[in-house]
């Protein structure tokens, strides 16, 4: 159950970088959209959306912004037909990358994603070419844990699949459909995650050479900045000396 989680360190570092870049709202809006897309716009019947709304409110997001994101995901915006599209490909150093998009113009999105891959030395692959290297999971990250035993007991009682400890931090893994329920149960037990989301998690990380690190980081950043992109995940394991 316990063990060093290099992924947690990488994920948490990325979360801090995202905050510095002012991407918190973007990520919250995307989660509202995706949650509504998969579970509908009724927060009473959609625990993942309920959690996303709670997070957005905590960051003082306006009601209008939240409602538009939810309607966009649920397909309730007049005259707008949204389509989910997934792209898979490889970046420098053989890094596997999955890009999930929500778009009203598939041709535009394909062109933008392909351009990013091409410009940064990557290649788009066919459907399924890298997906087998990832698993969808709910992830809850705790930065400072005072009582590991209590957290482990609460997590397992809430239905978590696994929990990994690394020094004072902890990473709890759940099935995607149990993510919101586990989160809410842990809050009731007195544990609130510092970071949490449903994401694709690489089964194994792929080492990035120092020579390729900057280009891989640039590719991931370019993809994340595209308007139609909902999420970008990779199995990149950047060298410690890389400061990108």
Curated annotation (Swiss-Prot):
Matching Gene3D superfamilies: 1.10.10.200, 3.30.70.980
Q: Name one GO molecular function term.
A: DNA binding
Sorted alphabetically, which Pfam families does this protein's record hold?
Answer: TACO1_YebC_N (PF20772), Transcrip_reg (PF01709)
Question: GO biological process annotations for this chain's record?
Answer: regulation of DNA-templated transcription
GO cellular component terms, alphabetically, are: cytosol
| Annotated keywords | Cytoplasm, DNA-binding, Transcription, Transcription regulation
This protein's major location comes to cytoplasm
Top-level taxon of origin: Bacteria
Compartment(s) of residence: Cytoplasm
NCBIfam families, per this entry? PRK00110.1, PRK12378.1, YebC/PmpR family DNA-binding transcriptional regulator
Give the similarity note. Belongs to the TACO1 family.
Q: What is this protein called?
A: Probable transcriptional regulatory protein DNO_1179
